[in-house]
Each structure stands twice: as structure tokens, then as C-alpha cells.
Amino acid sequence: MKAIFIILAILMVTQAFKMTSKVNTKLQSQIQSKFQSKNKLASTFQTSSQLKDSCLNDPEQRFYITGCSNNPVCGDAFDCSATGDDEEKCDAVGQNVIDLFYYFWGTCVNDYASCIMFAATTYNMYSGPENCGCINQVSYADWLDYFDCPSFSG
């Protein structure tokens, strides 16, 4: 009887890892496809610090970065239940964050510090129980890896 429970436990853990890996891979591939021409984008959007500052200081622009879950521009993508871990909704949130990041590429998110700030803020929206609660979908370390912030410092 114990052997059956042990086997069932192993199967459950294995399945959980497979599901998490599948979601992580999907989100990573979405980000990679968005930024496959990242170097071209980086050279195209050479913006002044004045433009960057206006993005971060203008309340309307800042709202996109820090308060997107309340912004109508985001539509249903942040319409997640407080219980979280709804795979379809978590994927929608992930895609919405990627789209926002792409939109701000080279303006608000154009150096290492702003990239880290954006990644941390969006992960809080993605994983926070008061927002989407998608914590079991993607870890914070993976989230940071996807945004590849160190590439901005070179």
C-alpha cells in the first residue's frame, strides 16, 4: 500500500514539473519571438534621456508601467481571479506584459535599471495575489532571465 502512495506522489510531482516547464517554455518563446531582432530595435530607438525621463515622470506614461492592471488599455489581459493559477489567464497576462515591454523598448526601458524596474513591477502584477496570482506559472528568476536586462548595460 505504501508503495502505491509513493508511486502516485512521484507521478504527481513529475506532472507538476512538466506543466510548469511547458508554461515557462511558452512564455520564453513568446518573448524570444518578440525580440528576435532586438539589436536592430536597440539601434533604431536611440532616445534621449529627456524622453526616458518624461516616460517615467509623466503620470500617464508611468501608469502603463506601474499600474497596468487598472489601465483600460490592458483590456481583459489582467482580468485574473484573485485565486490565480488559471493557465489561460496567466498566459494572457504574460503576453500583455511582453507587448508592453515591446512598446516601451528603447524609450522607458532603455537601460539596465529601467529594465530591472519594469521586470520587477510587472512580475508583481503577474504574481501578486491581489492582482493575478500567477506565482506557480513562472518564477521571478525565470521572469528576469526572459527580459535579459544585462544586455542593456553593454
Curated annotation (Swiss-Prot):
Signal sequence annotation: 1-16
Cellular component per GO, a single term: extracellular region
GO molecular function: pheromone activity
One Pfam family linked to the record: Euplotes_phero
Superkingdom field: Eukaryota
Stretches assigned to coiled coil: none
UniProt xrefs under InterPro entries: Mating_pheromone_EUPOC
Propeptide residue span(s): 17-52
Subcellular location: Secreted
Keyword Transport assigned: no
Coarse class of the protein's main subcellular location: secreted
Sorted UniProt keywords: Pheromone, Secreted, Signal
Function of the protein: Mating ciliate pheromones (or gamones) are diffusible extracellular communication signals that distinguish different intraspecific classes of cells commonly referred to as 'mating types'. They prepare the latter for conjugation by changing their cell surface properties.
Protein name, UniProt field: Mating pheromone 2
Protein's organism: Euplotoides octocarinatus
